[in-house]
């Protein structure tokens, strides 16, 4: 279990995440939903161990987030993080050397599914192709926690189905999958649990089906109600 207890992150006078508490259980796909600047990315970075909370605790299987937990967490940020000169094959080799849980066989299978070839250079990729490459890299790890920050950003409508199918294929009883997005309609049929974050605070969370039943609204319509200006 991945557990966040009263987690807060402040940058000077700005509070990016405020008192967040949530338990992420294996075998489920979670969606962190919210508009830009709501705190989704900051929360993910704290779970990944890239940013330290100002207060509160984050643990994975009872172990505080740190050096020991990083090897069990795969985190895909929104930014591109590959050198331009690298090809897909270079990137696969780099990750295989760096992460013991990285599978080159899975990686090449994902590349094929995403219509990417080993000789493609990072410098020549569109934003959509880069998004699919980042996804292939992270899904090829056998990590306990897989976090994907805005995995559908820059991906066209046709390719979104490829991305979603790839995520579903990775789901298993021993893995926690967390995705952040503001493209809620694309994720509604996939997610097991929805977390609505606004101004750094969780304003609603729960099993997706229970939320629909209790509100009489789809996750998409709940999103519109919560984030309507």
PLM-predicted stretches and their roles:
Residues 205-206:
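ABC ATPase "signature
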Residues 33-35:
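The feature captures the beta-strand-to-loop junction immediately N-terminal to the Walker
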Residues 146-150, 155:
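Catalytic Walker B motif of ABC-type/P-loop ATPase nucleotide-binding domains
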Residues 78-133:
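ABC-family P-loop ATPase nucleotide-binding domains
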Residues 56-69:
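Conserved ABC transporter NBD signature motif
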Residues 48:
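Helix-to-loop junction immediately C-terminal to a conserved catalytic motif
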């Amino acid at each position: 279990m991945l557990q966040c207890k009263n987690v807060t992150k402040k940058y000077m006078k700005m509070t990016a995440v405020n008192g967040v508490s949530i338990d992420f259980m294996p075998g489920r796909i979670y969606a962190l939903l919210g508009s830009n600047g709501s705190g989704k990315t900051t929360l993910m970075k704290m779970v990944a161990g890239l940013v330290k909370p100002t207060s509160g605790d984050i643990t994975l299987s009872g172990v505080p987030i740190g050096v020991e937990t990083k090897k069990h967490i795969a985190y895909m940020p929104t930014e591109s993080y590959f050198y331009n000169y690298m090809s897909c094959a270079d990137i696969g080799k780099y990750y295989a050397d760096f992460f013991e849980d990285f599978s080159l066989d899975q990686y090449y299978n994902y590349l094929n599914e995403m219509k990417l070839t080993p000789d493609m250079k990072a410098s020549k990729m569109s934003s959509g192709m880069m998004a699919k490459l980042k996804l292939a890299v992270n899904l090829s790890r056998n990590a306990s926690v897989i976090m994907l920050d805005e995995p559908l950003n820059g991906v066209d409508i046709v390719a979104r189905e490829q991305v979603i199918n790839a995520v579903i294929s990775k789901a298993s009883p021993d893995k926690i999958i967390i995705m952040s997005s503001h493209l809620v309609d694309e994720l509604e049929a996939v997610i097991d649990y929805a977390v609505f974050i606004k101004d750094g605070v969780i304003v609603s969370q729960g099993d997706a089906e229970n939320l629909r039943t209790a509100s009489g609204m789809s996750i998409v319509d709940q999103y519109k109600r919560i984030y309507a200006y």
